[in-house]
From Swiss-Prot:
Record text on subunit structure and interactions: The surface and transmembrane proteins form a heterodimer. They are attached by non-covalent interactions or by a labile interchain disulfide bond.
Motif CX6CC positions after renumbering to this chain: 431-439
Record site: Cleavage: R350, A351
Source organism of this protein record: Pan troglodytes (Chimpanzee)
Residue positions of motif CXXC: 43-46
Cytoplasmic side of membrane: 500-538
UniProt entry keywords in alphabetical sequence: Cell membrane, Cleavage on pair of basic residues, Disulfide bond, ERV, Glycoprotein, Membrane, Signal, Transmembrane, Transmembrane helix, Transposable element, Viral envelope protein, Virion
Transmembrane spans: 479-499
The name this protein goes by in its record: Syncytin-2
Length: 538
């Protein structure tokens, strides 16, 4: 298959190797140990350097859809026709923002994190959004989805936003709703969903509507003892164990399904009010995007992997985990494989059978049909996927700081081009002359350099270890070039020390026996009897 190895580790005991520069390999090593795998010791652990297939995606189980937490990111813009109403509109805006649960002002990371990722197995749940002018994030084929929910927007349907601060209550669009294939939901209902989620408090009607509906069982994802339930009012999923009481695991404040449906809305939330004028007056528009708060979980959309879905997204997505392509080979195999593409070494012609890490752990790719519990495979995917998320966060932090540095520099350059302080001293300086806010240089180059230096040090350490370590085959051959001439004398001396005393004893006995025989033969020739020879003083 022409596998090119990026990192190669060989040790008599893999459990003895621990290094912070290899978090993914460390995690793989720990998983092999915890599962009692026969490959937990004395094996080669390899990662692929192929950029075409950086890893493999695995879908989350139905129960994980009810436990993985999402978060919302909000931005807004005022209506261009809004005049003379900024003060009351600002008051309304602050109240509405407080009523949204778990809102994050930190800019999310948009765009695919990985591409050309293949999904292994069948996703239990997929969410499809169809927007004419939406941002396409990728589309999963229907053949890999067990149940597909389609999101419909209600941008033209309004309802009252109840708040005690207003005499005439503002009106907002209704939240988006979802449709599902015929036969997906059974008539069986449960009151298990009522009163949930309870991990946060909010007055926002999109999350805590006044009219609670009973949840309906999703037949394709449920078993006799474990039900996966859908609350169509709040667009939320719940997992109920029928053998236990009602007091079970707490539901996240913002569920994955709720966050995905909200982010599909065109312009998020459009606020209109009656009490500012005689007719409905547009005030401001919300843009809401969603991200997965649970570390290690990603949105899988087609062959693209996302950490966040933008506002007004379109496509077909599921959630799951991403694992790197890590392979195992038994330690008794000779693998003279060049590291980092060293072309000076001879190429190995024979094929080597590599074992995927998950196969070494005794895990097979599961499907999304009828599995409500969290499986051993899901936990493994989650642990490996968390290490990838940590690496992404490190790179994102460095890039974000660099962007802040560029923004700060751009502000100073634009300001300096408008004038010089010495030319506008009579007017109080350039800021007063231009009637603008004063911009100052915010030097964050130290943070940028520290973040980049950390990444470069990790890469440099790995590269140095690959080129100077004892596993470097080129260096090994140079080492043998001066050791080989000394091998012959050293081996000869060792053999002489081991077998020399034995050989000397044998030679002494042989010489002594030959001398006795010669002496006996001489006496017989002289006519003496052996007895006389023995009694003779001579």
């Amino acid at each position: 298959m022409g596998l090119l190895l990026l990192v190669l580790i060989l040790t008599p005991s893999l459990a003895a190797y621990r290094h912070p520069d290899f978090p993914l390999l460390e995690k793989a090593q720990q998983l092999l140990q915890s599962t009692g795998s026969p490959y937990s010791t004395n094996c080669w652990l390899c990662t692929s350097s192929s950029t075409e297939t950086p890893g493999t995606a695995y879908p989350a189980s139905p129960r994980e859809w009810t436990s993985i937490e999402a978060e919302l990111h909000i931005s807004y813009r005022w209506d261009p026709n809004l005049k003379g109403l900024m003060r009351p509109a600002n008051s309304l805006l602050s109240m509405v923002k407080q009523d949204f649960p778990d809102i994050r002002q930190k800019p999310p990371i948009f765009g695919p994190i990985f591409t050309n990722i293949n999904l292994m197995g069948i996703a239990p749940i997929c969410v499809m959004a169809k927007r004419k002018n939406g941002t396409n994030v990728g589309t999963l084929p229907s053949t890999v989805c067990n149940v597909t929910f389609t999101v419909d927007s209600n941008q033209q349907t309004y309802q009252t936003y109840t708040h005690n601060q207003f005499r005439h209550q503002p009106r907002f669009p209704k939240p988006p709703n979802i449709t599902f294939p015929q036969g997906t939901l059974l008539d069986k209902s449960s009151r298990f969903c009522q009163g949930r989620p309870s991990s946060c408090s909010t007055r926002n009607f999109w999350f805590r509507p006044a009219d609670y509906n009973q949840c309906l069982q999703i037949s394709n994802l449920s078993s006799t003892a474990e039900w996966v339930l859908l609350d169509q009012t709040r667009n939320s999923l719940f997992w109920e164990n029928k053998t236990k009481g009602a007091n079970q695991s707490q539901t996240p404040c913002v569920q994955v399904l709720a966050g995905m449906t909200i982010a599909t809305s065109y312009l998020g939330i459009s606020a209109v009010s009656e009490f500012f004028g005689t007719s409905l007056t547009p005030l401001f528009h919300f843009h809401i995007s969603t991200c997965l708060k649970t570390q290690g979980a990603f949105y899988i959309c087609g062959q693209s992997i996302h950490q966040c879905l933008p506002s007004n997204w379109t496509g077909t997505c599921t959630i799951g985990y991403v694992t790197p392509d890590i392979f195992i080979a038994p330690g008794n195999l000779s693998l003279p494989i060049p590291i980092y593409g060293n072309s000076q070494l001879p190429r190995v012609r024979r094929a080597i059978h590599f074992i995927p890490l998950l196969a070494g752990l005794g895990i097979l790719a599961g499907t999304g049909t009828g599995i409500a519990g969290i499986t051993k495979a899901s936990l493994t995917y989650s642990q490996l996927s968390k290490e990838i998320a940590n690496n992404i966060d490190t790179m994102a932090k460095a890039l974000t700081t660099m962007q802040e540095q560029i923004d700060s520099l751009a502000a100073v350059v634009l300001q300096n081009r408008r004038g010089l302080d010495m030319l506008t001293a009579a007017q109080g300086g350039i800021c007063l002359a231009l009637d603008e806010k004063c911009c100052f240089w915010v030097n964050q180059s130290g943070k940028v350099q520290d973040n980049i230096r950390q990444l470069l040090n990790q890469a440099s350490s790995l590269r140095e270890r690959a080129t100077q370590g004892w596993l470097n085959w080129e260096g090994t051959w140079k080492w043998f070039s001066w050791v080989l001439p000394l091998t012959g004398p050293l081996v000869s001396l060792l053999l002489l020390l081991l077998f020399g005393p034995c050989l000397l004893n044998l030679i002494t006995q042989f010489v002594s026996s030959r001398l006795q025989a010669i002496k006996l033969q001489t006496n017989l020739s002289a006519g003496r009897h052996p007895r006389n020879i023995q009694e003779s003083p001579f």
